[in-house]
Regions:
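Histidine-centered active-site loop/cap adjacent to the catalytic His
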Residues: 352-383
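Bacterial N-terminal signal peptides
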Residues: 26-36
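Substrate-gating cap/lid alpha-helix
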Residues: 301-339, 364, 383
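Oxyanion-hole/transition-state-stabilizing segment in secreted/luminal serine hydrolases
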Residues: 213, 225, 242-287, 298-305
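Short helix-loop-beta junction
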Residues: 222-235, 326
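N-terminal secretory targeting modules
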Residues: 1-22, 37-200, 374-383
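Catalytic nucleophile-elbow at a beta strand-turn-alpha helix junction centered on a G-D-S/GDSL motif
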Residues: 198-219
Length: 383
């Protein structure tokens, strides 16, 4: 019997039916009792706590607002990117609780879902609970996508077994998060938890890194890489805006990181790659002289399959990327180029729109890049 609804049973008696019904009265009373218990469970009181009082992970540097990725009052960013800095992409709340139920109330902007994204990824929440040392999917906070689209209230999971749980709640991929409250059983305990990930790997890139077309908020490849490896992966993906700008290079140079992974060849043209690559690396190297810098070759976009214009643009871009990185590798032994071939496979089913990987696309991508990234990081004791 669902615990989300209340039920009322009406029994109408008359002289012709009274006796047959009376024969089944015990069964009716039992059914009524079960439904009453269900109604009582659905009305169990919930206590909400401000998620900002728990542990928020996933930021490269601290911010005044709890769910922003970059504090734009302190750091200059490229002109078109401040709004993306307010997206809590890759951020998560980690906490312990013995509650059998987890709910959430949260507030986003009122913008409509994008045409190539799932609303539950763009505006929703994605919960994982640790089981036998692994982060296991537990449920989602489904956003409201009618009306103003800005205030949401959802049951993420209920009827869990008793006992303490370690929880990892990913925040929306592609919308501003203004407020978040986590609801637990009134008499249960909920408390901050230490960051469960180790080291610090900053992943900077395009909409592919941002997670456009991922199925849930925790399914961008950097988040999956973190859960797979236990490494603390920071998502600094900015949809359409990663072209090795000096503002981003300056910001990254201030971040203490054990390694950087770059998806920085997806947005710029070959000309921009040739113009900006060396200056971008030079800025980061001033404060990170020996930190491993891992550059990913951009994906092969399906949009080039029949367009001669896109084919030419993409081919030239990929050639420029490889040439620039390999030339720099001649004088810098801590720079790496990861090009495992066709990142998204050859079956034409791994993107939402010819460019942005779906969960399947990210699986193909990780199958190819994760072993190489692990091998590189292992040289530096990053495991």
């Amino acid at each position: 019997i669902s615990s989300d609804y209340n039920y009322t049973i009406f029994v109408f008696l008359n002289t012709k039916t009274t006796l047959p019904i009376m024969k089944h009265l015990p069964l009716l009373l039992l059914l009524g009792g079960l439904l009453s218990a269900s109604a009582a469970r659905s009305a169990d009181p919930v206590r909400y706590v401000d998620a900002a009082t728990l542990t928020v992970i996933g930021k490269a540097l601290s911010t005044e607002q709890p769910y922003n990725r970059i504090d734009t009052t302190r750091f200059r960013v490229p002109a078109k990117t401040p709004g993306y800095c307010y997206h809590p992409t890759g951020l998560a709340v980690v906490f312990r609780t013995d509650s059998r139920t987890i709910r959430a109330r949260w507030e986003t902007s009122g913008k409509n879902p994008s045409d190539n994204m799932a609303a539950v990824a763009q505006k929703g929440l994605d919960l994982y609970i640790r089981s036998n040392g692994e982060w296991v999917f537990a449920g989602v906070g489904r956003p409201k996508i009618n009306g103003k689209n800005d205030r949401h209230d959802a049951a993420i999971i209920s009827n869990m077994a008793e006992g303490e749980k370690e929880c990892l709640l990913y925040l929306p991929l592609y919308d501003q998060l203004k407020k978040l409250e986590i609801g637990v059983d009134e008499k249960s305990v909920i408390a901050p938890m230490e960051n469960p990930f180790r080291h610090k790997i900053v992943v900077h890139g395009s909409s592919i890194t941002h997670g456009i077309a991922a199925g849930r908020a925790g399914m961008a490849y950097s988040s999956r890489l973190g859960r797979d490896t236990g490494l603390y992966c920071i998502n600094l993906g900015f949809s359409g805006q990663c072209t090795m700008q000096p503002e981003f290079a300056s910001y990254l140079s201030r971040v203490e990181a054990d390694a950087f992974v770059f998806d920085c060849f997806s947005n710029p043209s070959a000309e921009v790659i040739n113009e900006r690559f060396d200056a971008f690396v030079d800025t980061i190297r001033r404060t990170h002289p020996t930190t491993p810098l891992i550059f990913l070759q951009t994906i092969r976009r399906e949009t080039r399959n029949f367009s001669t214009r896109i084919e030419k643009f993409e081919r030239e871009k990929q050639a420029a990327a490889e040439a620039q990185v390999r030339d720099r590798m001649k004088t810098d032994k801590n720079i790496y180029f990861v090009d495992p071939g066709d990142l998204l496979g050859s079956d034409h089913i791994a993107t939402a729109d010819g460019t942005h990987p779906t969960d399947l696309g990210f699986t193909y991508m990780l199958d190819r890049i994760e072993p190489q990234i692990r091998k590189i990081l292992g040289k530096y004791g990053i495991r």
